Structures are given as C-alpha cells and as structure tokens.
Amino acid sequence: MSRIGKKPVPIPQNVQVEIKDGNCVLVKGPLGQLEKTFSPLLTIKKVDNQIVVERPNDEKFVKALHGLTRALINNMVLGVTQGFEKRLELQGTGYRARVQGNKLILEVGFSHPVELEIPTGLTVTVQDNTKISVKGIDKELVGQFAAIVRSVRPAEPYKGKGIRYEGEKIRQKAGKAGKK
C-alpha cells in the first residue's frame, strides 16, 4: 500500500464531512467549506471519526492516486480548521505593494504598477508596503496566487531584488569581472 494513502484522515470534533456519489467529498469547518471530486478509481469511506481511502489494485497509477487523494483530503480538513498562509517579501529600492479593493497593486520597477485580481476565498494583507500575506482555506489556491505574485518579479541572483517567499534564500552570483 501507499505509505501516505493507507493512513486514515482523522476528523476533528468541529468538522463535518459528507461523501456524495462515492467520490465527491464536502468538508465543513469553522473557517468555511471545501468540496472536491476525486477519481472514481478509488473508494472513499467515512469510518468512525476518520476518512479512509481504498484502492482496488496495485497498479502504479492507482497507487499514486491513492496517496494524492489522501493528502488532498487531509489538506481540506486542515484548511477548514486552521487555514493556510504564504508570506512574500519585496526587496528593492522603491518596491511597494498595496491592496485596493479586491486588487493587489505591485510597484516593482516597471514603468507601470502591476494589478492582480485577488481570487474569492483569499485574504491578502500588506504590512510596511513590503510584506505580503496570502491567507485562505484552500491550500492550492493560496499557493497558486502566491506563485503568481512572485512570478511578477522573481528575485534576481545578482542583487537579490524582486519578490521572494519569506525565508527563501537566493543564491548570489558574482558579477562580471570587468576590464583591467
């Protein structure tokens, strides 16, 4: 069995889980609700206070789906109880960010500010004009939006200017040696 897939997903007290049509899972918790449809190759059951994912055979593809499905369900349960957060930093002279309505506006050295639409279900806050925090209950959506923000101006390896995740290390390169 898949090492991750064979572990049952525990359901906390304040979370309700519904399994519809055998492969559609609805998770409701204090922070909101998430619904996701999974592959019909797998069987998803609610046993006691746990969700168990079972697979019909040991084909490589099905084994991979087994672990993936269990991890996604676990992330749904964690999302509706704790939520997820990604933090980004802007580094560079004059680099600023601000939230205006449902848009994140980035001024990162281009001739114009870059406006990004904040997806529904996410909360974006900016501290000190240089620290961006993306919060939400859907791990995939939080990570995807944070990656989109970072891709506007990824940190460059010479001076380290750009947008990076908090705590991300950028490998510095030596500049060219110049004439002597």
Curated annotation (Swiss-Prot):
Q: Which UniProt keywords apply?
A: Ribonucleoprotein, Ribosomal protein, RNA-binding, rRNA-binding
Q: How does it assemble?
A: Part of the 50S ribosomal subunit.
* Record's protein name: Large ribosomal subunit protein uL6
Q: GO cellular component terms?
A: cytosolic large ribosomal subunit
Q: Name one GO molecular function term.
A: rRNA binding
Name the job this protein performs.
This protein binds to the 23S rRNA, and is important in its secondary structure. It is located near the subunit interface in the base of the L7/L12 stalk, and near the tRNA binding site of the peptidyltransferase center.
Q: Which family does it belong to?
A: Belongs to the universal ribosomal protein uL6 family.
Pfam families reported for this sequence = Ribosomal_L6
Task: Kindly give the Gene3D superfamilies that the UniProt entry links to this protein.
Answer: Ribosomal protein L6, alpha-beta domain
Annotated InterPro entries: Ribosomal_uL6-like (IPR000702), Ribosomal_uL6-like_a/b-dom_sf (IPR036789), Ribosomal_uL6_a/b-dom (IPR020040), Ribosomal_uL6_bac-type (IPR019906)
Task: Write the gene name.
Answer: rplF
Gene Ontology BP, a term: cytoplasmic translation
